[in-house]
């Protein structure tokens, strides 16, 4: 018996996916990055961290993150945004100004009991 709807990498069709990005290479990078975010979401779900956004389309049991990512791209719920050199420089400067980790000792203000 044959399936009427194609499954696997051909669903959604590559032509429909390429309407949302300008090249196959960018499509692969975009879908892979989004699939990693979805995978991280599922990994963090049990821990209650929820640092990543979960699937934005309906999913089925045992559906792979890459398939979910491609369906999100086809539906237009995620968009690829290319950063120019100015945006990258501004983001790097902001990251250097505000460190993510404080290196100060929280117990430095406490009196030394041996003194």
UniProtKB/Swiss-Prot annotation:
Signal peptide: none annotated. GO terms for molecular function: DNA binding; DNA-directed RNA polymerase activity. This is DNA-directed RNA polymerase subunit omega. GO terms for biological process: DNA-templated transcription. GO terms for cellular component: DNA-directed RNA polymerase complex. It comes from Cutibacterium acnes (strain DSM 16379 / KPA171202). Gene3D superfamilies: 3.90.940.10. Keywords: DNA-directed RNA polymerase, Nucleotidyltransferase, Transcription, Transferase. Belongs to the RNA polymerase subunit omega family. The keyword Transcription applies. It comes from the Bacteria. It catalyses: RNA(n) + a ribonucleoside 5'-triphosphate = RNA(n+1) + diphosphate. Pfam families: RNA_pol_Rpb6. Its EC number is 2.7.7.6. The RNAP catalytic core consists of 2 alpha, 1 beta, 1 beta' and 1 omega subunit. When a sigma factor is associated with the core the holoenzyme is formed, which can initiate transcription. InterPro entries: DNA-dir_RNA_pol_omega (IPR003716), Pol_omega/Rpo6/RPB6 (IPR006110), RPB6/omega-like_sf (IPR036161). Promotes RNA polymerase assembly. Latches the N- and C-terminal regions of the beta' subunit thereby facilitating its interaction with the beta and alpha subunits. The gene is rpoZ.
């Amino acid at each position: 018996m044959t399936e009427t709807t194609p499954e696997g990498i051909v669903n959604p069709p590559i032509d429909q996916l390429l309407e949302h990005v300008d090249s196959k290479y960018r499509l692969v990078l975009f879908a892979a990055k989004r699939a990693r975010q979805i995978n991280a979401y599922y990994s963090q779900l049990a821990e209650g961290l929820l640092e990543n956004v979960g699937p934005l389309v309906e999913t089925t049991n045992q559906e792979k993150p890459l398939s979910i990512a491609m369906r999100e791209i086809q539906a237009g719920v995620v968009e690829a945004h290319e950063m120019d050199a100015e945006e990258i420089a501004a983001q790097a400067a902001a990251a250097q100004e505000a460190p993510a980790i404080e290196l100060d000792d929280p117990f430095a203000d406490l009196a030394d009991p041996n003194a």
